[in-house]
Curated annotation (Swiss-Prot):
It comes from Drosophila melanogaster. The gene is Clbn. Residues 214-231, 782-796, 845-874 have a biased composition (Basic and acidic residues). The keyword Mitochondrion applies. GO terms for molecular function: ribosomal large subunit binding; tRNA binding. The lineage of its organism: Eukaryota, Metazoa, Ecdysozoa, Arthropoda, Hexapoda. Residues 214-245, 688-715, 771-895 are annotated as: Disordered. Expressed in enterocytes (at protein level). This is Ribosome quality control complex subunit NEMF homolog. The N-terminal domain contains a nuclear export signal. The C-terminal domain may interact with cargo proteins.
């Protein structure tokens, strides 16, 4: 099977890529450490083309969507830095070698990407002087040639084009060839066209098996021994072609060879024109079928830009361009592997069935043969009754005379020497078993030809204790016993064969089903995240780590979407996609909150905490002046809507992909139910109580002490919130839900998290404030707010306008509180809260930019605020990969969600099954489900047990069982939060 480009492929590929000259690099991605994608865009053109290069293997344009790494590699970042928005100026082959040079930009701003397509391959990024800026595989060749950064790329190392072979050069080449060399071996290193072209032109002119034969015979043994050094494969090839070798005639064959060389050069010129079609050479593989009909599967083996004559008897697929053929060849490699694996499994299953049939047939044949032999022996004893009786009596007489066994042997030999007929019929004495072997023939089988040939003799064992008739009867009994055994064997064989055939057909069915499911299985974009579909048909996604948290907020969160987060550090960022723009029902909010809590450190800690939701416009990556938001960190502005506490209960279930014609039967399975909304709304919106109903004694639970250890300055109100996502570390500050609400209201006024985690210069400080979501007394809160606000205002020497700030902040002086309260009343409509918070963080006296006014006034409702004070010189470690050119789904694709059901009906056409981990309340109506709670069990073991439970369900149909078999345990376990306890009805019977 062809795996990489040859010289002629490179010639045609470079010529075809000339159409991309002048296009700009839009973006660069890496598929793996050897394969890179260049997203190209023409000037003023809407169309985009993706150029794929793979070190040591290939380069071509592609229309397929290749998987890209979540974060770009270091090499990709280097390529982006130097090549992004650069114009592709030149694509050329270096000399006649398998090296391609892509030039981006011109003059001193030019950069080269050099792709090596031989040996282990390489990709080198150089500047305009070909000085290496970055190299994929640094190495050395010999003592002087070094491939590394800041080394100049050796252009002279590339193989230079050979001169056109004239008649004299061709004759000299043939004269210098060794005796026994094939013409293709001589021409390949001397023509810049590759072995496929040379084989084509030689076959076209009838010179494919011509070898050089010289008159001297001294070198013949050496020539014959030479292929032995090439290994087993070369020796086998030599043996196969040895009989077809033809000597090359320098007189008659030389003009033909010269014409063949010209044809090869014409093919190269045709390839340089860039008008090559593409061909994929295929092999027809016969597929075994259940009903005996013949089916075929076409396996791709090679790709070429020209239909060579050596492939005229092969199946082929034709394409308009060579790039299309290469793209199709490599893009279908995975499905071809699946088909070949399926074919191999089918063949193995049928081979086992064939072996069973052959074994049974062999056993029946042996039983039939035994019957024939026993019957024949019985007939021979009957036909030679007197002879058999005489032999038995003679031996019995010798035994009765008390002769020793050696004496009896000597007696028989003497009788045979004397020509005794009875003694001559004795073949062997088996006195240890009381038997003798007689040589018997049919006395009635006397034809005219008997005088010319000896009669057929059969050796028959005779029991000395029985007469001739009794021995004959014994053989007849043995024959009947064998016949009965044969009958039983036939009956058993039929049952065994039916069972084997049934198992084989079942195996074939399973193999084909799994193969079809794997090929039909569409991996949806949201499966790379934590995800589930809510009870009301909203798609909910969450990030697995900081990079994915960044990704879903930047790429997938749209206006009207809801951002959900747990009131705990290290939780996943959860997005509820809202394509309709309508208000998200409370039940979906609760389920998303449960997901956010479960995918956090709360799961392993087995603690219950709160979650909250905000709208998408409240989430921002805009950091305070002078600060940096690390990957996965966001600023949340305004009020947070807290959700009721929920249990750490998740569920594992299956969603089935429906065929389009069956989707309508399942519409409305996940719809909004108003009664449930009415029941849940009071709990969900308990934070939205009007402020005039709050008492004066409400606890200022959101107060934060941001002063130095020696300062008593307090800051109140509702500061902007930055959620720092760290899955590995983090301090958990939660409120216990087991406390009596009345007692808790009293305690919560005292449990105000006003401590600050001390921050060093090289350590990021995170402040997570977890507060209650219940009603508080207003007076206490207002008192504290006024006091804290007064102290903040006292830190200024003069009353600032909205866009100004104090130059010399100081502590509040005695006697200024009354004046500051008047100032506060005067400037109460100004939203300077964010400016004050930033000033306190930065300890800066510089001026800030004006803040937004009326649209960003923060309500004084209960909410918990978080603030992360990152490192002074923080920098992103792993930038998140954002594909700006990719089409981003706007909200959940409703059609896709409607095509997935957890409640398959009888008669539905199910295409494949997708495992889903979701809050258990979202799975109440699903057919297959198990409950997951924090425990000590491993995720893989729990997933395996869940599959076993689903497969053994009485209501599980045959198709559903087939789909279950195609699900891998790792895909089932990857979304389980952590150590887990699995719960299901009658769980004990599934444990082995």
């Amino acid at each position: 099977m062809k795996t990489r480009f040859n010289t002629f492929d490179i010639i045609c590929g470079v010529a075809e890529l000339q159409k991309l000259v002048g296009w700009r690099v839009n973006q660069i991605y890496d598929v793996d450490n050897k394969t890179y994608l260049f997203r190209m865009q023409g000037t003023g053109a809407v169309e985009k083309v993706t150029l794929l290069i793979e070190s040591g293997t290939r380069f071509h344009t592609t229309r397929f969507e290749w998987p890209k790494n979540m974060a770009p590699s270091g090499f990709s970042m280097k390529l982006r830095k130097h090549l992004k928005n650069k114009r592709l100026e030149k694509v050329q082959q270096m000399g006649s070698d398998r090296i391609v040079d892509f030039q981006f930009g011109t003059g001193d701003a030019a950069y080269h990407v050099i792709l090596e397509l031989y040996d282990r391959g390489n990709v080198i990024l150089t500047d305009y002087e070909l000085t290496t800026l970055y190299i994929l595989r640094p190495h050395t060749e010999g003592e002087n040639l070094r491939f590394a950064m800041r080394e100049k790329y050796p252009v002279e190392r590339a193989k230079q084009p050979t001169k056109e072979l004239e008649l004299e050069a061709l004759v000299k080449l043939l004269e210098n060839a060794r005796n026994g060399d094939y013409l293709r071996q001589i021409l390949t290193p001397n023509l810049d066209c590759g072995p496929a072209v040379i084989e084509h032109v030689l076959l076209s002119h009838g010179l494919d098996n011509h070898v050089i034969k010289k008159e001297t015979t001294e070198e013949t043994p050496e020539a014959e021994d030479k292929p032995e050094k090439g290994g087993k494969k070369q020796r086998k090839k030599q043996q196969n072609t040895k009989l077809e070798q033809k000597p090359f005639d320098m007189v008659n064959d030389l003009p033909i060879l010269q014409q063949a060389v010209k044809d090869a050069q014409e093919l190269i010129a045709e390839g340089n024109s860039g008008k090559s079609k593409g061909y994929i050479i295929q092999v027809k593989e016969e597929k075994p079928t259940e009903n005996g009909t013949v089916e075929f599967f076409f396996r791709n083996i090679e790709f070429h830009p020209y239909l060579f004559i050596q492939f005229k008897n092969f199946e082929k697929a034709t394409f308009e361009s060579f790039m299309e053929a290469v793209d199709e060849f490599y893009s279908t490699q995975e499905s071809q592997k699946i088909d070949m694996k399926t074919l191999q499994q089918e063949r193995e299953a049928l081979k086992k069935l064939s072996n069973v049939k052959n074994d049974h047939a062999k056993r029946l044949e042996e039983l039939t043969k035994v019957q024939d032999v026993d019957r024949k022996k019985a007939e021979l004893i009957t036909s030679n009754q007197s002879l058999v009786d005489n032999a038995i009596r003679a031996v019995q007489s010798a035994i009765a005379s008390q002769l020793s066994w050696p004496d009896i042997h000597e007696l028989v030999k003497e009788a045979q020497a004397n020509g005794d007929a009875v003694a001559s019929s004795i073949k062997q004495l088996k006195l240890e078993t009381n038997h003798i072997s007689l040589m018997l023939s049919d006395p009635y089988d006397n034809d005219e030809d008997d005088d010319l040939k000896d009669p057929e003799v059969t050796v028959v064992d005779v029991d000395l204790a029985l007469s001739a008739w009794a021995n004959a009867r014994r053989y007849y009994d043995m024959k009947r016993s064998a016949a009965q055994k044969e009958k039983k064997t036939v009956d058993a064989s039929q049952k065994a064969l039916k069972s084997a055939e049934r198992k084989t057909q079942q195996t074939l069915k399973e193999v084909r089903t799994i193969s079809n499911i794997v090929k039909a299985r569409k991996v949806f974009w949201f499966e790379k995240f934590y995800w589930f579909i809510s009870s009301e048909n909203y798609l909910v996604i969450g990030g697995r780590d900081a990079q994915q948290n960044e990704l879903i907020v930047k790429r997938y969160m749209r206006p009207k979407d809801i951002y959900v987060h747990a009131e705990i550090q290290g939780a996943s960022s959860v997005i509820i996609q809202n394509p309709t723009g309508e208000e998200i029902p409370p039940k979906t909010l609760l389920e998303a909150g449960s997901m956010a809590i479960s995918y956090s450190v709360a799961w392993d800690a087995k603690v219950v905490t709160n979650s909250y939701w905000v709208t998408s416009d409240q989430v921002s990556k805009t950091a305070p002046t002078g600060e940096y938001l690390a990957t996965g960190s966001f600023m949340i502005r305004g009020k947070k809507n807290f959700l009721p506490s929920c249990h750490l209960t998740m569920g594992l279930s299956l969603l089935f992909k429906l065929e389009d014609s069956f989707i309508e039967r399942h519409l409305g399975e996940r719809k909004v139910r108003s009664l449930e909304d009415d029941q849940i709304d009071p709990n969900v919106k308990e934070n939205e109580v009007e402020h005039d109903l709050l008492s004066d004694n409400e606890d200022a639970d959101s107060n934060i002490n941001l002063s130095e250890p020696s300062s008593n300055t307090e800051i109140t109100a509702f500061p902007n919130t930055e959620v720092k996502i760290e899955h590995d570390t983090g301090r958990i500050i939660v409120r216990s839900d087991s406390v009596n609400p009345e007692i808790e209201e009293t305690k919560e006024s005292e449990v105000v998290l006003d401590k600050i985690l001390k921050k060093t210069d090289d350590e990021e400080t995170t402040i997570i404030l977890a507060g209650p979501s219940r009603k508080k007394q207003v007076s206490a809160k207002k008192t504290k707010e006024d006091k804290a606000r007064a102290k903040q205002e006292a830190a200024k020497q003069e009353v600032p306008p909205v866009s100004s700030e104090p130059k010399n902040p100081s502590q509040v002086k005695r006697g200024q509180k009354g004046k500051l309260k008047k100032m506060k009343q005067k400037y109460k409509d100004q939203d300077d809260e964010e400016r004050e918070i930033r000033m306190m963080i930065l300890k800066s006296s510089g001026k800030e930019k004006p803040q937004a006014s009326a649209d960003k006034v923060v309500e004084k409702s209960e909410s918990t605020k978080e603030y992360v004070k990152p490192e002074k010189s923080a920098a992103p470690k792993n930038p998140v990969e954002l594909d700006d050119a990719d089409e981003v789904p706007v909200g959940g694709d409703v059609d896709v969600l409607n095509s997935l059901t957890g409640q398959p009906h009888e008669g539905d056409e199910l295409l494949f099954a997708i495992p889903v981990v979701a809050p258990y309340q979202a799975l109440q109506n699903y057919k297959f489900k198990v409950k997951l709670t924090p425990g000590t069990g491993k995720r893989g073991k729990a997933a395996k047990l869940a599959l076993n439970i689903f497969a053994k369900e009485k209501s599980c149909s045959a198709r559903e069982k087939d789909l279950l078999k195609s699900i891998k345990e790792e895909s089932l376990a990857r979304n389980i939060p952590g150590k887990v306890k699995l719960s299901a009805p009658q769980l004990q019977k599934y444990h082995k």
